[in-house]
């Protein structure tokens, strides 16, 4: 019940455990596209988007506790404003090395903020970010005789981030916030003196359709990235932070083969490599969660991935049945993951592994390169028309990673999940029934760096009175959707979701999924 303008000193008890208070927000989105037809079938497209939200309360932070009491009275995102302007030119040519092409420029501006105030405190902290993103993409292709085709292109991006942070005392008049005190500098979320991330890449891809039974593909991409970040001396958590420059380049490749032994079957195998340079979020972010503070690490290096994929597709001659199986294995070199990090210049606490941050002693961790890791998994999906009007769909995915004895389980490995659905279509009406499900994940399989949000899972009280997190329980969700085409220009959509009103939370989420909901929508084409 506390907000930007409201103040309440005492805790309010939520009488309904299934009701997640302070989770509503509003957002306005504007979309407009202009299409200009040019001579010789060339097309110019202009895409303009603007969105703005209200304040958005962070439910998982508002329910966070310390020493048995709520930690925050306020924790919300301020209104996010996003502007996108993107012109794109699609053209055709009769040149030998250029038959078709598309050039796209994009500019995006994002303003966002994070505001919090601790319980029983009158000090409100604000972190504000202004992000400007520029990008230019050019994609071109041509084809030759004997089944040869070549595509090639370039990409350039530039991201500029300005970060500001301050605290203010709120001035109270009854239950109203009547004014704010002077601003005091506090640590920023991103480098306080500005940061930028740029990249330039070029690629070429060759496809050879040798015959109806065999296709070979080879591609390569050269990528250059550059990161710059600077910190001001004031309100810094680490006196050794000043400037960081990280320039990296990598040549990555892809080789694939597709075999079609019959009209029903297709067999594919792909061998590829990947590269990811640390971005501003990886190197320079400061973020506190449950007494753990992620701090900048200017010594972070790129990570590399080496992948092997294999797949089999089956499609019946009449195309009424389809089945796909995929499996993959990936080795990640110099894997970036969170680990303990000591700020040697800090003397605010006698423990080198902790510092004082916003008046609280917190343990410091940072992103580090921690050797090689291995991921593998599979997915199966397909459909079948049981009759002209009824279609059955199904899918399932499973991923697992190795468990390093020193660094623990890998982060962001979700439990097995899938879906089963049936669709009935007749004339202007379509009825769909969807069943989604997920397996569980043991707390022992959560990453040690906190990326997976173990503290957001259910709590178990042991016989000794100790509190233990249960991990992610398995869950399921059954929903029904109906679409009715009143006319070509008017369409009605009605849905009843989570019919059995199951209370569940998806993996790594800080908020539960919606309960039983009735939805109605109307599509009008003017």
Language-model-detected regions and their locations in the chain:
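Repeated loop/turn-to-beta-strand initiation elements of outer-membrane beta-barrel proteins
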Residues: 41-44, 94-101, 111, 147-150, ...
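Surface-exposed extracellular loop regions of Gram-negative outer-membrane beta-barrel proteins
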Residues: 109-113, 224-235, 245, 259, ...
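Outer-membrane beta-barrel "beta-signal"
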Residues: 256-258, 309-313, 514-526
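Outer-membrane beta-barrel signature, preferentially recognizing the C-terminal barrel domain
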Residues: 71-94, 191-197, 242-252, 256-260, ...
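Extracellular loop and loop/strand-boundary signature of outer-membrane beta-barrel proteins
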Residues: 15-20, 69-77, 88-90, 119-128, ...
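Gram-negative outer-membrane beta-barrel transporters
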Residues: 211-212, 224-225, 328-331, 348-448, ...
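Signature of Gram-negative outer-membrane beta-barrel scaffolds
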Residues: 151-262, 277, 287-290
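Transmembrane beta-barrel wall of Gram-negative outer-membrane proteins
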Residues: 1-55, 81-83, 145, 210, ...
């Amino acid at each position: 019940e506390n907000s930007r303008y409201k103040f309440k000193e005492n805790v309010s008890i939520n009488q309904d455990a299934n009701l997640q208070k302070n989770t509503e927000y509003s957002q306005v989105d504007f979309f407009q596209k202009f299409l200009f037809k040019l001579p010789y079938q060339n097309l110019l497209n202009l895409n303009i988007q603007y969105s703005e939200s209200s304040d958005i309360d962070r439910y998982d932070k508002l329910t966070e506790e310390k020493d048995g009491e709520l930690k925050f009275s306020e924790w919300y995102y301020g209104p996010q404003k996003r502007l996108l302007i993107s012109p794109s030119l699609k053209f055709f040519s009769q040149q030998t090395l250029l038959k078709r092409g598309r050039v796209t420029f994009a500019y995006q501006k994002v303003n966002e903020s994070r505001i919090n105030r601790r319980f029983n405190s009158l000090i409100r902290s604000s972190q504000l970010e202004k992000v400007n993103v520029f990008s230019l993409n050019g994609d071109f292709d041509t084809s030759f005789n004997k089944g040869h085709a070549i595509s090639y292109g370039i990409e350039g991006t530039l991201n500029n981030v300005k970060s500001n942070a301050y605290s203010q005392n709120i001035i109270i008049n009854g239950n109203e916030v009547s004014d704010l005190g002077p601003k005091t500098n506090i640590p920023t979320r991103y480098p306080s003196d500005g940061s930028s991330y740029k990249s330039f890449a070029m690629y070429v891809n060759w496809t050879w359709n040798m015959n109806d039974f065999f296709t070979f593909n080879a591609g390569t991409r050269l990528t250059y990235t550059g990161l710059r970040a600077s910190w001001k001396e004031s309100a810094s958590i680490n006196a050794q932070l000043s400037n960081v420059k990280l320039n990296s380049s990598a040549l990555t490749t892809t080789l694939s083969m597709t075999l079609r032994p019959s009209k029903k079957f297709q067999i594919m195998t792909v061998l590829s490599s990947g590269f990811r340079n640390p971005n501003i979020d990886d190197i320079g972010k400061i973020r506190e969660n449950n007494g753990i503070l992620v701090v900048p690490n200017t010594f972070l290096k790129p990570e590399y991935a080496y992948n092997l994929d294999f797949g089999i597709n089956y499609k019946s001659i009449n195309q009424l049945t389809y089945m796909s199986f995929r499996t993959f294995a990936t080795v990640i070199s110099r894997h970036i993951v969170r680990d303990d990090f000591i700020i040697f210049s800090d003397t605010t606490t006698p423990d080198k592994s902790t510092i004082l941050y916003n008046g609280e002693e917190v343990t410091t961790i940072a992103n580090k390169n921690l050797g090689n890791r291995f991921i593998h998994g599979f997915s199966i999906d397909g459909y079948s028309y049981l009759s002209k009007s009824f279609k059955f769909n199904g899918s399932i995915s499973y991923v697992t990673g190795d468990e390093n004895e020193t660094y623990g389980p890998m982060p962001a490995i979700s439990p097995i999940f899938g879906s089963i659905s049936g669709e009935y279509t007749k004339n202007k009406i379509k009825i769909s029934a969807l069943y989604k499900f997920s397996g569980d994940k043991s707390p022992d399989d959560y990453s040690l760096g906190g990326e997976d949000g173990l503290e957001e899972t259910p709590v178990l009280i042991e016989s000794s009175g100790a509190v233990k997190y249960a991990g992610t329980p398995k869950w399921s969700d059954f929903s029904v959707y109906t679409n009715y085409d009143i006319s070509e220009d008017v369409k009605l959509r009605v849905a009843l979701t989570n019919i059995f009103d199951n209370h569940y939370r998806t993996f790594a989420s800080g908020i539960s999924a919606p309960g039983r909901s009735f939805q109605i929508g109307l599509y009008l084409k003017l």
